[in-house]
Amino acid sequence: MLERLYDANIYNILSRLRPEKVRNKAIELYWVFRAIHICHAPLVLDIVRYEEPDFAELAFICAAYFGEPQVMYLLYKYMPLTRAVLTDAIQISLESNNQVGICYAYLMGGSLKGLVSAPLRKRLRAKLRSQRKKKDVLSPHDFLLLLQ
C-alpha cells in the first residue's frame, strides 16, 4: 500500500513537469519506478532503449527522485541530458527532500537558479570554483554538507 502511495506521489510530480509524456507512458513508467526502486540500472537502461529518446529524460528525473546515483550516472552516460532536464531533476529532488539527487544532478551540470536561495547558490558556486582551481574534486558528501 505504501509503495502505491509512493508511486502516486512521483507520478503526480512528473505529470506537472511533463504532462503529455507521463500520460502516454504510464505503464512503462511503472516498470521504470520498480527498476529504479530496486536500483537495477541495467534493467532501467534496457527499458529506456526500447522507448523514444526523451523517455530517458523521464527515467533520469525518476532516478533523481529516488536518489539512485548509479541509475542517474548510467542514464547520463547513455544519453546527453539538457540543462532543463537536470534542473527538473533538482526540482523533483527538492520536492522529495532527496539531497543525493540534488547533489548528483547539480554536479552533472544542473542549475540551482530559482530553486534554492541566492546566498546558498553563491556559496556552492564559490566552493566548486575553489575546488576546481586546486584541481581537487568536491566529493558528493562534502557537497551535501554545503547544502545543509
UniProtKB/Swiss-Prot annotation:
Going by the entry's taxonomy, the superkingdom of the source organism is recorded as Viruses
The record describes the protein's role as: Plays a role in virus cell tropism, and may be required for efficient virus replication in macrophages.
What family does the database annotate?
Answer: Belongs to the asfivirus MGF 360 family.
Name the UniProt record assigns to this protein:
Protein MGF 360-18R
